[in-house]
C-alpha cells in the first residue's frame, strides 16, 4: 500500500495525504481500544524505516543548508521528525538526524562538529507545554549565533511570543519555504 502510494506522490504529498491520515486513524483506533499500543508502535516503526530508506535516496543540492535534526530531551517519538527530514531532504537539504535522548549540550556539540547551518527540534503535541519555551531559550543560549534554530511540530503552538533567534515552523509548507530563505542570524 505505502509503496504504491509513494510512487504517485512527492514526499510532501505522501506525508501529508497518506502517512498523516493513516497515523491519525491508527491513533484514533488505539484511543477507542480497537487496537493495542503494539499495533501503533509496529506501524510507526515500519513507516520510520521506510522514510529512512527514502531519505537515503535523495541527493543534496548546493546552496541549501546543512540541517541537524533531533528531538528535545525527554522526547522519543521519531516519526514526525523523520517526516520533516524526508520532505526537506527531497528538496535537497543536507540532513543529519541524530534522533532522541540527546542532552542539549550534546546537541550543541553535534551541531558544531557537523558544521550545521540549522539545528532543528521537533516538539510533538504531547511534549510538556511548560517545557517548550525554556528548552528553546536554553538551546539558543548554548548554540553559537551562526547556527539557526528551527522549532517545529504541533507542540510549538503553546509558544505565544517567538523567541529571538528561533524560527518557528508551523507546518511542512513553511519548512519547505524556510529552505529558500536566507538564514536569520
Where are these regions (language model features)?
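Long amphipathic alpha-helical segments
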Residues: 1-59
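C-terminal regulatory/effector modules of DNA-binding transcriptional regulators
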Residues: 34-36, 42-185
Amino acid at each position: 500500500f505505502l509503496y504504491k502510494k509513494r510512487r504517485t506522490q512527492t514526499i510532501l504529498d505522501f506525508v501529508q495525504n497518506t502517512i498523516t491520515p493513516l497515523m491519525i486513524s491508527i491513533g484514533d483506533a488505539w484511543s477507542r481500544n480497537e487496537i493495542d499500543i503494539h499495533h501503533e508502535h509496529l506501524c510507526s516503526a515500519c513507516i520510520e524505516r521506510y522514510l529512512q530508506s527514502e531519505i537515503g535516496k535523495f541527493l543534496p543540492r548546493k546552496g541549501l543548508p546543512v540541517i541537524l535534526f533531533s528531538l528535545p530531551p525527554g522526547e522519543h517519538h521519531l516519526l514526525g521528525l523523520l517526516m520533516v527530514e524526508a520532505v526537506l531532504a527531497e528538496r535537497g537539504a543536507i540532513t543529519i538526524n541524530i534522533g532522541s535522548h540527546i542532552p542539549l549540550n550534546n546537541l550543541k556539540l553535534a551541531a558544531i562538529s557537523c558544521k550545521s547551518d540549522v539545528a532543528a527540534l521537533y516538539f510533538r503535541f504531547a511534549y510538556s507545554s511548560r517545557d517548550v519555551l525554556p528548552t528553546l531559550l536554553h538551546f539558543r543560549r548554548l548554540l553559537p549565533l551562526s547556527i539557526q534554530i528551527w522549532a517545529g511540530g504541533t507542540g510549538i503552538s503553546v509558544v505565544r511570543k517567538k523567541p529571538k533567534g528561533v524560527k518557528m515552523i508551523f507546518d511542512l509548507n513553511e519548512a519547505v519555504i524556510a529552505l529558500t530563505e536566507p538564514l536569520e542570524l
